[in-house]
Amino acid sequence: MDDTKDEKMSERTFLRQVKKQDGGRQKFDPLKIERCISKSLVDAKVEFTQERVEELTGDVVDILYDMKQKCVSNDSVADAVKKVLREVSMDAYDAYIIVRNRRDRERALRSPIIKTVREIKHADLPSSNILRDNANESGDTPAGMYGKIASETNKMYNLLDNVSKKYAEEHTNGYLHIHDLNMYDLTFNCLFAPVGKKLRTGFDSGTGFQRPAQTIQSAAALTAVILQLQSNQQYGGIACDNFDFELAPFVDRSFRRNLAIQLNAMADYSEDPAFAQYLQQEGDADIEATIKRITKGLAKDGVSMNTPTTSLYFLFPKKCIDKAIAFTDCDTHQAMEALVHNLNSLQSRSGNQVPFSSLNFGLDVSACGRMVSKNLMRAQYEGMGDGLTAIFPILIFKLMKGYSFLETDPNFDLKQQAIRCLARRFYPNFVSVDSTFNKPYVKYLTKTIEIGDPSLFTAKVRGKDELVHVERVEKTEFPIYEYHIAPDDLWEVVDFDGKTINLRKLVENTTVATMGCRTRVIGNVNGPEQTTGRGNFAFHTINLPRLAIESRIAKTSEEDRIKLFFEKLDGMLDDAKESLVERFNLVCMKTYKTFPFTMQEGLYLTSDDKEHELSDDIAEVMKQSTLSIGYIGIAETITLLTGKTYGVDHEVDALAVSIVKHIRDFCDATQKKTHMNWSCFATPAEAVAGRFATIDAKKFGDNKKLADINLQRIFGKGYYTNSHMMDFSLDVSLDDKIKVEAPFHALTNAGHIFYYKLNGDLTKNVEAVGAAIDAMYNGNLGYFTVTMDSDDCIKCGYHGIINNVCPKCGCKDEKYFIRVRRITGYLTGSPRKTIKLSWNDGKVKELGDRHNI
């Protein structure tokens, strides 16, 4: 190329760049174009001179120059070359296409997505964290592999195209974790589903309309369907916040049907003319029609199993009542048994997992509600096939004085049953409605009436046998959307002076509930402060140890380190907030059409307040949800900042609390500014615990400025400790652990959990389990449980602790051992997959260290 032409090209291409396929940029070099043209002509066996090649190169440069851009894409350069070669020789054009396609293929095979797909399809399960990032998803099945490929592909797409560059880099580099990145642009996290509402009205399942439930069996079956359908339109957990209240009306329907059957049977041989109405009538097509007619009449007359049996005996033969109650109890047990089995077998999300379901219960003191609670726990206690522990649903028992905590409370016996069930089957977990940060949200209907009012009905006085007549209340003094009002017999007489009666009735869905993993909603700046029909939209987690590492490297004095740490934390809080808002706005562009069950069937609060078009976006509805900022690694953070051990050196515990309070204060301030529901979250950290630790170990593991601290305590474990939990390997008493961790529960209004591990076979030490639960309740914890090791040998049926050999049959083959363990809030354990085949590396290492959880 002569100097004049080269100078002309340089002038035209001054400061011009080429944007590569991977997004990077490089200086524009005409000589590369010249070499491509020359090679294409050679491959096509076209005769040419150097001058001709330089001329063609100049033509390509002219095309690019005419684009008037300082930076052109790699594809634009290729298109220009193809255009010039096509005019010279189609053979040369084809030769260039072949070379370019080969390079594109080689480049594609080196791409991250192809490497990930190879790992998913070909890696050995124990060596792949991608296949084990969720302990209850099967990454080695066809559906599991398919789901993982789609998941990992959408993660990469979102990082490149949807997440702002700054937040994408913070996620990739381990400052901030964007949870469920695979679903970032598609949907929301979790929901407390209004199951009772859909059981009463029926619903469209997508392939047909499901009729309203008429019995407890059909209600339980449809509950599983509702939870499965909703699970497919979100990515997180699905829960019922008051399962006993929701299902109790259908127990009553079964009772009336069973009573109708008994009355019909008695009418066959009774000479009492009053029983003639229970015989088959001329208008009844068959016996089923007769039973339906009788059942309908009983409902119209207000006959209920919640009515004291002594009163029912005045209306119907005692034998009929007793049998109807007994058969209803049997029906309820079978219904709960079927529900547990269905929720462990109905596959959702492309057949890769069952719904991550949770059922909150324990406060319904009616006969029907108590029957639901009793039989749900009975089904859990009995286990599934071969007596194995059910992984789902996660059962959560609500503790509340006056209802289910004290010995004098009507549901105290259910609390005792819950403790026995926990000792055998890990569940229920417990939630305290009475904790100082939960109790203020509880609401009651109240009414003061005078004796002699004409519109009266009977209400039971708590703890007494006599009945008091009180007025039926239809309205309340606070706004109601869809509050669930307890049955009439659940009115409490607060006081009675002989003339005036003061009453109250619990509005049960204002009592706290939680997802099994710990996520919850509480408070609402955009609607009623209820749980039903609401959920968490999304949460992002801040890597606190990373900020502490950088602060320790930068500053030598403890005071300066802590000051810098909080400055860095402020920056990350802003980024966490903005990244969540960005995510929220993206998903809220989706329409009712995208969510045929959630929105069109009215599961989300306010989604059916008015008529909606399928093209309407979901932004207004999603304002009922919460946005949460989580954190991880308080234990490691305190060590890095002070050199001391959190929970042992108590002088640094206040610093730990101040860090989380700083996050909570930020969330509260953001809520006021944005008028959105913001909350502080104690992150469960299943996959992120190992991910953050691995990234930080690679980056800082050999940093000389960290030589004065025991890095084995930080990086050697292979994971960071969950949220504010104490180091799992510490030998600490229950009381001490409560004192250290309880203050965080008041701060983490997006969710939290407390565990304490008891050793041995807890079925032989139920009293210790009960004492531990009471201590947690009295320690002002919000959500808590006892955890343990639980093993089963499916070869001989032994249950207990199995080390390497079954104590009963001597079996040494691990494939016969079911080792159920609690991974975060939920369980994992299967006869097909050992812990090492289902837990990621970080969680496997954590399991080996566990001493106090």
Language model features with spans:
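Conformational switch/transducer regions in large eukaryotic molecular machines and scaffolds
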Residues: D29, L41, E47, N804, ...
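Charged, amphipathic alpha-helical regulatory modules used
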Residues: D2-I120, K843-D849
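Conserved catalytic cores of very large enzyme subunits
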Residues: E106, P112-K623, K644-T645, D649-R822
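Short, hydrophobic beta-strand segments
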Residues: R16, V60-Y65, S357-S358, E636-G643, ...
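Short, solvent-exposed secondary-structure capping/transition elements
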Residues: K45-T49, S73, M90-D94, S551-K555, ...
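Contiguous, well-ordered alpha-helical segments that form the cores/surfaces of helical PPI scaffolds
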Residues: L627-L640, K661, R822
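Long insertion/accessory domains within large nucleic-acid-processing enzymes
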Residues: P807-I853
